[in-house]
Amino acid sequence: MGEAWSGSLIKKHLTELADVIGPRWGGSDGDHRAAEYIREQMEAAGLDRAEIESFTIDTWSHGDVSITLPDDPERVIASLPFLRCKPIDVTTPLVDVGHASPHEVDALGDRIKGSIVLASISPEPFTSPEPFTARIARLAKAGAACIIAIEPKTGGRMEYASTDEWLNVSPQKDALAVVKTSLEDGAYLQRIATTSPAIRVSVDAKYLDSEGHNTVAEIKGTTHPERHLILGGHHDTVLGTAGGNDNTSGTIGVMETARVIAALGSELGIKPGMSIRFATWSGEEQHLQGARAYVAHHHSPSSPSREANPLLNINLDELSTGHMKGIVLSFPHLRKFVQAQLDTMDDGLKCHVLDHMDAHSDHFPFVEEAIDASMTWRWRFFGRHEDANFHHEIGDAANKLNVRELKEYAGQLARILLRLSHVVPDDWPTNPMTVEDVNQMIERDAGGHHSAFH
């Protein structure tokens, strides 16, 4: 797999996607330009087909956002809306709710109702951890008018975050407004909150329909072309960032793996048995809308274009946060089968199974249809690179992409995909999961806390 190193186009793709095109919010011009570039590069790499699949995306944008103190108008308070924050302009006394744990909310009682509340995103120490989305729901139930959420990262950094649960909730337009402030400004507001100062939160935002653009390319199999595997990753970013790590790294991982496998076929005659599909998604940062549109079109029982399900989806997201350690499955029945294939590579790669439903990347729309889906084992589980602790923020620039490790990803992914493609479809373990099974698992896990770093 030396082609992953000697013929690497990573720096070329990084320059175009991160520096030339830049931010690629789903439904924006940057999203469209990225899709066109990816399609052109897949064609140039010699894949059998490379197309753009457009879809209607329920998107959002914001204008001016501010947190101000009417009695101290010269004081500048950092502000950033949560994604899909509704427009709001409200002034109330400030109420500090700490971490918004149950005992803190109960103790404040009616003071929360109709007030702007200040809450730490970090969970309360020595208590059962719960996601901030659950604490947002608690504050909404208590009648808060708006939340100022304190960013846990230091040094004035702030990253876009989501207000709502992704496991069983579609994109919202009427959720409680949440605006983030920096750790430093949050500490200042905590200091003055004991005096209940007046505070104003203003967000100019709108919801609109636009056109998102997925890319779908394919190398046809030689023995079972009617069945396929799929390698995917989202090419969109949040607003205002080039997304070097999240997810230019995963996008280029898809592109480079496709190029390497295509080159093996054209130069050495080594071709996949089953077809291998390579996709990049728009709208991941907006409730996985691109991957959901693809699954609805290709695999929904009600779709006139329905085709056979992929035998496995492998999702690439934030690859620069750690080197490849293996594959993590959503369902357990493929564990021994995939591990046996990894063992033939003799690189110590391991196959594991998630113990919960994870809706935070583009494998999940496949999971919802009970399709076998997985992601690479990297930062979510062990060994996150500290210098790559960037995703939904301006600092996630081109220099956050780890070029050397991405070459390794492309080589390793090409090897595992080729091995899997040459296993006769009938020899794969049968998938016993149903959509009903998955829905029960989603309901079981919705609102729960699942550590991302363990």
Where are these regions (language model features)?
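Short helix-loop-beta-strand segments that form the rim/entrance of peptidase-like active sites
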Residues: 12, 261-289
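Metal-dependent peptidase/peptidase-like ectodomains
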Residues: 186, 281-385
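Soluble metallo-hydrolase cores and metallopeptidase-like ectodomains found primarily
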Residues: 72, 76-106, 166-244, 256-259, ...
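Noncatalytic luminal/extracellular "stalk/propeptide" segments of secretory-pathway proteins
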Residues: 7-8, 12-116, 122-123
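Extracellular/luminal Protease-associated
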Residues: 28, 77-171, 175-177, 242, ...
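N-terminal capping segment at the start of a domain
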Residues: 2-29, 45, 159, 166, ...
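Second-shell loop/turn segments in exported
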Residues: 1-5, 19-29, 81, 94-96, ...
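His/Asp/Glu-rich mid-to-C-terminal helical/loop segments that flank catalytic regions of hydrolases
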Residues: 384-454
